[in-house]
């Protein structure tokens, strides 16, 4: 199955990859919360050692300027400001010896910090 999510607004493949692994983990977390209305919000904000950092939270509300994508029944929300920094990125979920975490591979990042949670563009 393709890792490309569908953009709800256009029905076209989204320019942000939301992997099967990430969608499955989000579905598991939503089930644990017991609220099927939850959506994963991914955002970029100022901070971190490289200037910007990624954030993840659950949200029930879709804002007017949000881009909404769906993958395997899971919805992903990205606000307009964050979207410009995330176009072309891959949102994945990895489990390895170092632990389990959501990972963003972002081609727009000119530098990243050692922890991988902040970047500059």
Swiss-Prot record:
Q: Name one GO molecular function term.
A: 4 iron, 4 sulfur cluster binding
State how the cofactor is bound: Binds 1 iron-sulfur cluster per subunit.
* Binding-site residues for iron-sulfur cluster, renumbered to this chain: 49, 113, 115
Q: Which residues form the signal peptide?
A: none
Cofactors demanded by this protein = iron-sulfur cluster
Q: Which UniProt keywords apply?
A: Iron, Iron-sulfur, Metal-binding
Q: Which GO terms describe its biological process?
A: iron-sulfur cluster assembly
| Pfam families registered for this protein in UniProt | Fe-S_biosyn
The task this protein performs is described as: Required for insertion of 4Fe-4S clusters.
**Subunit info?**
Homodimer.
Provide the family line: Belongs to the HesB/IscA family.
Q: What is this protein called?
A: Putative iron-sulfur cluster insertion protein ErpA
């Amino acid at each position: 199955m393709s890792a490309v999510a569908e953009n709800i607004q256009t029905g076209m493949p989204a320019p942000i990859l939301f992997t099967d692994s990430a969608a499955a983990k989000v579905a598991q977390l939503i089930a644990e919360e017991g609220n099927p209305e939850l959506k994963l919000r991914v955002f970029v904000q100022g901070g971190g050692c490289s200037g910007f950092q990624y954030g993840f939270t659950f949200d029930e509300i879709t804002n007017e300027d949000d881009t909404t994508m769906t993958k395997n029944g899971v919805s992903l929300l990205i606000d307009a400001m964050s979207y410009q920094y995330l176009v072309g990125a891959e949102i994945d979920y990895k489990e390895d010896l170092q632990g389990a975490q959501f990972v963003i591979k972002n081609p727009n990042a000119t530098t990243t910090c050692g922890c991988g949670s902040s970047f500059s563009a």
